Amino acid sequence: MITWDMVKADESLLGAFIGQLSTYDLARMAVCAKNGWGMDQKGEAGRIFVMEKYGTPEFVFADGNNGVNLNEKNIGFPCSVTVCATFNEELAYETGTAIADEAKEKEVNVILAPAANLHRNPLGGRNAEYFSEDPFLAGKMAGNHGKGLEDHGVASCMKHI
C-alpha cells in the first residue's frame, strides 16, 4: 500500500497511489465532501474527504477572489477589475500572496480563484470578479494573482474560464 507520505517523499508514486484508490474514494474526493455530502458551518466551499487508511490530509476549499470567503471576519481586498485597472502585475501577485497568508491562518488549503472570465457586457453581474475584457491583460493579471497564492503555499483553482 502506498501512503500519502510516501507520495510526498517521491512524487513518481502519485500515479500508483491514485491507481490503488476505489471508485468510491475518488468520487468522494472529487465532490469535496467530508464525512458526508455538503458544507459545515465555517462556510468553506468544501473539504476533501480524508482517507485515514492512506494518510491523506484534509484540504479545505474557500472562494476567494477578493479575500478568504468564510462565515467569519476576513480582509476584503479590492475587486479584480480594480486591481486590473492599475495594469500592475506585481499588485495582482501581491494580492494573491496576502490572500494566501490569510488562508493559511484560517487553515484553508485551496482558494477557488482567480476568476478568469472576460467582461463581455458592461451589465454583467459578476464583472467585478473578473479582471478585464482584454484576454491578454486578464490572463496576465489572473496568472500573477494565482502565482502569488501558490508561491505562498496555497493552491489556486482558476475558475470561470
Q: At which residue positions do the language-model features occur?
A:
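Glycoside hydrolase catalytic-domain context in secreted enzymes
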Residues: 1-161
